[in-house]
Amino acid sequence: MGKLRRRYNIKGRQQAGPGPSKGPPEPPPVQLELEDKDTLKGVDASNALVLPGKKKKKTKAPPLSKKEKKPLTKKEKKVLQKILEQKEKKSQRAEMLQKLSEVQASEAEMRLFYTTSKLGTGNRMYHTKEKADEVVAPGQEKISSLSGAHRKRRRWPSAEEEEEEEEESESELEEESELDEDPAAEPAEAGVGTTVAPLPPAPAPSSQPVPAGMTVPPPPAAAPPLPRALAKPAVFIPVNRSPEMQEERLKLPILSEEQVIMEAVAEHPIVIVCGETGSGKTTQVPQFLYEAGFSSEDSIIGVTEPRRVAAVAMSQRVAKEMNLSQRVVSYQIRYEGNVTEETRIKFMTDGVLLKEIQKDFLLLRYKVVIIDEAHERSVYTDILIGLLSRIVTLRAKRNLPLKLLIMSATLRVEDFTQNPRLFAKPPPVIKVESRQFPVTVHFNKRTPLEDYSGECFRKVCKIHRMLPAGGILVFLTGQAEVHALCRRLRKAFPPSRARPQEKDDDQKDSVEEMRKFKKSRARAKKARAEVLPQINLDHYSVLPAGEGDEDREAEVDEEEGALDSDLDLDLGDGGQDGGEQPDASLPLHVLPLYSLLAPEKQAQVFKPPPEGTRLCVVATNVAETSLTIPGIKYVVDCGKVKKRYYDRVTGVSSFRVTWVSQASADQRAGRAGRTEPGHCYRLYSSAVFGDFEQFPPPEITRRPVEDLILQMKALNVEKVINFPFPTPPSVEALLAAEELLIALGALQPPQKAERVKQLQENRLSCPITALGRTMATFPVAPRYAKMLALSRQHGCLPYAITIVASMTVRELFEELDRPAASDEELTRLKSKRARVAQMKRTWAGQGASLKLGDLMVLLGAVGACEYASCTPQFCEANGLRYKAMMEIRRLRGQLTTAVNAVCPEAELFVDPKMQPPTESQVTYLRQIVTAGLGDHLARRVQSEEMLEDKWRNAYKTPLLDDPVFIHPSSVLFKELPEFVVYQEIVETTKMYMKGVSSVEVQWIPALLPSYCQFDKPLEEPAPTYCPERGRVLCHRASVFYRVGWPLPAIEVDFPEGIDRYKHFARFLLEGQVFRKLASYRSCLLSSPGTMLKTWARLQPRTESLLRALVAEKADCHEALLAAWKKNPKYLLAEYCEWLPQAMHPDIEKAWPPTTVH
């Protein structure tokens, strides 16, 4: 049976029976006759005669039939149960919506989402801002939101008529749920999300006639179609990849984002791609662009990397994946490259692209430039992004679009997207998922402060002995720590060299060794137990005994039971540690990895380990982002990093071991889990990790920027402070850089100003000089570029190029101060140190060459190595780094090419059999080095100035208050010259000068006048005139700036002022400036020395001649010739005043007297 329908308002519609209705009865109508025969109709309540005689009986309506309640059936119970559940859901809806609103994405994020249902349908998944505005009006975006979720939909009129009646089964519970709804729910729900106004319903078609007098508005006219740009034909370049390589590519997360990335590139000039390490962005995005035709028409896809290792490795990997030759996918780094005319994808370091911008500012050969690893925020990366932001705009105006892709491994892109000076319109950001497999991060319960290297060793031993197969990657801080840990691990787990027939014997030996190891470990524990411990009461809790024991027991159980949680198992301390015992049954393939390692040794980490061994790579932060090592499952992170810090003012550099940032720690953890779920073991607690800075500071804020300032000035960026840096350097760093460049002669001095603000602006906008443009062409630091620019004379260029190349490439000699692992190694290191010290003394020589100091050692080492054909055997025998020597060779070639481009007549070439310099050339080289390193001058502390013992054998520098010392490895360590210049100061236990060369005191005011404060010209010796230079010279004493070191008087140009004009007039009258006037000297009416007398103004002839010289600023030979070129009769009248009247006609005929000089 169907359900009985309950009619609407059934009680009100029920009709009464025959009985009287409820309420007072109506009186019967009565007619009364009056005396005037009229009748009065109605009821007169006051007349008792017309009242009814008796009360009528009331009849009650029959009562409504009441049905007896029947017991509910199972079906009805289910229906009621559903209604109760619905009511419960409605009561909880407000709370649920409130919680959802807290985690709801914003509208800006919602617009970035796309649907995968349109894949392959031809519809765009990524719309530009302009097209979005055309389709949807502002404020009418229909975004899926929780806003208005509590409201009912608007019902059509027809639906209202059809649903007048409700089902009877939903009677009481339904009415309660509708009427007794929580009044607080509506405002709570109304506040969730953003309210979207509902669209007005379309008018329903009606067949009713239109009433008279009403006009029907005509339908709106269709909008004219918008003009659409002509679609360009799609370009697709086929790539023949191998099936195996294609299968590997499909596993990368970025492959699913190819359409999104390419649509964004097509619609926007600048795109930011964020994908953590391992997502494949470095290798796949260039391939996307290549297949889309961005390398057609002889164009190039440029990819910049911050490190040379990454540029070379990535070019080889992409060429292998695309099955193309390295003539098509090439690389270019500082010293080498394989770029050809066929190159279409070019990997390079950021410095190489910056040099290309100097030659071709618009980069016309490039269609796309990719800035990779932008999260590292290297100096050149920041400069490139600032320059490319303007180049993209200029190329767009010329209808030659350039696409810029910025790829970052972190989501720290606010410096790019929220920097209106850099990008006026924020570029779109595309997020790419990274890892295919999860990485579990484990923290230590305790943080080792000192012996983190030993903690790394113990952790690796535990992982290797107890965890399943998988490569191990260990992060340490420096080269010495890497080698020390490698030696310990190789000693603990020596590689197995057994033959197959010896396996059984090895197994027996390993079992016997394990048994002995357990016995020795037990004895060691017993021995440690017998030693009375030293109890420190500060290590104990103040809680009463028993309190907190449960927690401690739980921690012990957790430590022993859950290996994956911490691996914090106690293996003992010191020499008794079981990890130090050799265990040949568990071979470990240990490899080092750091930036100074030879390339062939770096490539070994990418090869599979020998069969039966586990790969363990001990690396510095070079393996943090640039390289992905295959097969790594476990990462051991010490949490430390060694950074070079520079003092902006003093230039002192120091290496400090500090904590990494949280972003760097996450990058290290990302090295695991490439092929399977991985684990990262951090040797610090989670509380320490919480105190890390979120991101490392950009490099441009931590180092001197004079080389960048010079390069930008060469690009005609005069006001560097207005450059669109992603993170601008401090004003102090900019001022220090410009002061150095002014002292080097690369920039013009700032113009004088009356206001301080204007003076500071002038100091930050000094124009570049001709010398500065020449220096900018050399790919070295400004100090070294000044040395190259000054070394053209006396045949010093080949030697200066070699010295500059050696100073640019760091760490020429091997690090021999590392700790030895055995007595044999200690003996070998001692003998090698002695040999290297002897070779340094040999290369330094004696006499004049020894005064060149450490730079002579560099020159001799490079010359000897080149003479021996630069073989690895020679480098190993003499303690030289083969990789450094090869870099010097390449840099020498590059600098020689640059010098020949600036000075073609030099005709330089790299001579492998270069002869040692002569004594005179060594002297010139010392002067050249002094002129380039003038701000790095130091003076030995004299005995009378020595106030404390710490100043013994110390030197004083202008910018430091503390003593500095010559490094013990220097050949001048025992010589102790009075004045030296140094390459750099490195702070360790003391401040040591490296790259030291001796300086003669009389050279300082002549070569470094900008650093000296000169006194007034000396009267004795008297000023003289120099015919070669055409200037007035004098002797002046001076002091070195800031420290006031007294310097001897030297002959310099006479200072500007009225006295210089007086001396020049005197030499002019004497005939020293122009020899033709010397014949008239005996006929002068007054002595030329009258010009210098205090009473000279009393004579008209002296005053008129002086005024004429000052008016044309003629204080030298060159200025006087320029004045006569403008006016040949210049000074004729003034000179005639000094001669008798009879000689005036002869003077007028011979004027100007420039025929003989």
From Swiss-Prot:
Bias-annotated ranges (Pro residues): 21-30, 198-208, 216-225
Q: Which GO terms describe its biological process?
A: brain development; maturation of SSU-rRNA from tricistronic rRNA transcript (SSU-rRNA, 5.8S rRNA, LSU-rRNA); positive regulation of male gonad development; ribosomal small subunit biogenesis; ribosome assembly; ribosome biogenesis
Q: What is its EC number?
A: 3.6.4.13
GO molecular function (one): ATP binding
What, per the annotation, is the impact of changing E167S?
Answer: In NEDBAVC; uncertain significance; requires 2 nucleotide substitutions
The UniProt transmembrane annotation reads none
* Known outcome of mutating T282A: Impairs the catalytic activity of the helicase
Q: What class of enzyme is it?
A: hydrolase
Basic residues composition-biased segments? 1-10
User: What coarse category fits the chief subcellular location reported for this protein?
Assistant: nucleus
Q: List the catalytic activities from the record.
A: ATP + H2O = ADP + phosphate + H(+)
Where in or outside the cell?
Nucleus, Nucleolus; Cytoplasm; Nucleus membrane
Q: Which Pfam families match?
A: DEAD (PF00270), DHX37_C (PF23362), HA2_C (PF21010), HA2_N (PF04408), Helicase_C (PF00271), OB_NTP_bind (PF07717)
Residue stretches of biased makeup (Basic and acidic residues) = 499-515
Region of interest (Disordered), residue spans: 1-77, 116-225, 494-523, 542-584
Q: Supply the InterPro entries for this chain.
A: DEAD-box_helicase_OB_fold (IPR011709), DEAD/DEAH_box_helicase_dom (IPR011545), DHX37-like_C (IPR056371), HA2_WH (IPR048333), Helicase-assoc_dom (IPR007502), Helicase_ATP-bd (IPR014001), Helicase_C-like (IPR001650), P-loop_NTPase (IPR027417)
* Disulfide linkage: none
Consequence recorded when altering G1030E: In SRXY11; uncertain significance
> Residue limits of the Helicase C-terminal domain?
459-716
Q: Which keywords does this Swiss-Prot/TrEMBL entry list? A: ATP-binding, Cytoplasm, Disease variant, Helicase, Hydrolase, Intellectual disability, Membrane, Nucleotide-binding, Nucleus
According to the record, mutating V731M results in: In NEDBAVC; uncertain significance
Cellular component GO terms held in the UniProt record:
cytoplasm; nuclear membrane; nucleolus; nucleoplasm; small-subunit processome
Q: What does this protein do?
A: ATP-binding RNA helicase that plays a role in maturation of the small ribosomal subunit in ribosome biogenesis. Required for the release of the U3 snoRNP from pre-ribosomal particles. Part of the small subunit (SSU) processome, first precursor of the small eukaryotic ribosomal subunit.
Subunit structure, interactors included: Part of the small subunit (SSU) processome, composed of more than 70 proteins and the RNA chaperone small nucleolar RNA (snoRNA) U3. Interacts with UTP14A.
Describe the family membership recorded for this protein in Swiss-Prot or TrEMBL: Belongs to the DEAD box helicase family. DEAH subfamily.
Its recorded name reads: Probable ATP-dependent RNA helicase DHX37
Q: What is the lineage of its organism?
A: Eukaryota, Metazoa, Chordata, Craniata, Vertebrata
